[in-house]
C-alpha cells in the first residue's frame, strides 16, 4: 500500500539544507545551531523530493557527528511511526522543497580533516566535532600526525599555532585559542 504512495525516505537534515551524503557532518562543520530529520518522497535527483514533515533538534557545543547521529536516529524512529498512518490515509501533505535554498552535503574526504590553524577557533572545533569519529580531524606536528578527538574554546591569546600552556592550548586565526582535550 505504501508503494502506491511512492517511496519514503528519512533524511538526516532539515531539507532543503544539506542534501547529500554527509548532512550531519556538514551541519556541525558549518556551525549550525539546529539540525533534524525530514520525511520525504524519493525522487530521481538526490534528496529533492517533497517533504511532509521536518523535526528539529539543537546542536549543543559538546555534540559531535556520533551524538547527533544517535539523537537523529531516535527522533526518526519515533516520528516515522507518527507519519506512516497519515501517509497511507492521505491525511498528510507533501510540499515541494524550495530548490533555491538547497545546500549540498558532499561526501567527506579524509584530506578535509587537516587542521589549518589560521582558521577561527570555532571553525576548527566544528571540524573536530563534525569529523568525529571518522575520518577525524588531525594536525601535523614535527612530522607526526595527531588525530584530534575533542577540543573546546579556551581563553588564551597568542600567535597562530603557538602552544600556550601546560596542557595543549593552541592559538587560532581569530586570536582565540582551543584547548585540545583528547588526541
Where are these regions (language model features)?
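Acyl-group handling in specialized metabolite and lipid biosynthesis
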Residues: 106-119
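Donor/substrate-binding cores of folate-linked one-carbon enzymes
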Residues: 1-104
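A generic structural signal for well-ordered coil/turn residues at beta-strand boundaries
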Residues: 33-36, 47-48, 53, 109-111, ...
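Basic side chains
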Residues: 19, 107-110, 127, 145
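Short secondary-structure boundary/capping segments
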Residues: 29, 43, 105-107, 138, ...
